[in-house]
């Protein structure tokens, strides 16, 4: 059971925690090519842990549930995330599998390529989730990503639907999503590529229009699965919110910055969004706040290290067009 009182409002993040091994170079290598002259850095990462850091730094009480190895990387994860103020008391240590690792290559424009060895993350199972049922049902907002097994994700949302939490899915890395999951979530947050791939995986007809109209139509189709909000992140172009119940589309611009590292920007967005929803903000206002936060994160190296604090976001949001 968590250290937090069960009647406190909190963000619950369930997902992955990795060690990120980053190489920064002028450009990304092509298949079969070696690019030299880069610099190396080691950071804590994993979509779930990144989002937990973003949530807690932006002011929300935050609980993280995941599975990490009984190894030095796992020790670092537990220590560092606890120091951030995240409740890690429900994290499972796996004696049989190593902690997850991500190898990340980043070019001079901040664009990246990532390869992940999930390790213990991929052994977070349904029984681990059932043991945490009360924590899940009593969360104010819940975020899950797809670096853990799909059957585990399905169990999470089944349990969450017995409570009143705001259920958010970040469908990354994208893979086929059972209809039972889509019918159990309130908000889905894909990037543009994930939106179109999910639309195709769900066997909707090909959309002939381009640009914003294509995003809106894909969002409408996916929302008909029963999802209240489809929020599509567009990187430097901001994001588009589709509200199914109101039939309203809202475009949120971003803040122009000099991006040096986009790793973790989406995680920053998701974690901060969950934090603001936990505090009672509307979806549109929460998205604006999350957009401002992500615009800070891309100006810094590292995933968790780049996550801004509440006071920084409060200043940055004043620059939103």
Predicted feature residues:
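Glycine-rich phosphate/adenosyl-contacting loop at the front of the ribokinase-like
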Residues: 1-67, 72-86, 258-259
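Active-site-proximal loop->helix
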Residues: 72-84, 102-106, 110, 128
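A glycine-rich helix N-cap at a beta->alpha junction
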Residues: 84-96
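A short, aliphatic-rich alpha-helical micro-motif
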Residues: 133-137, 182-183, 224
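Conserved phosphate-binding/catalytic region of the ribokinase-like
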Residues: 2-8, 176, 180, 206-321
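Conserved beta-alpha-beta core of the PfkB/ribokinase-like small-molecule kinase fold
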Residues: 141-217, 237-239
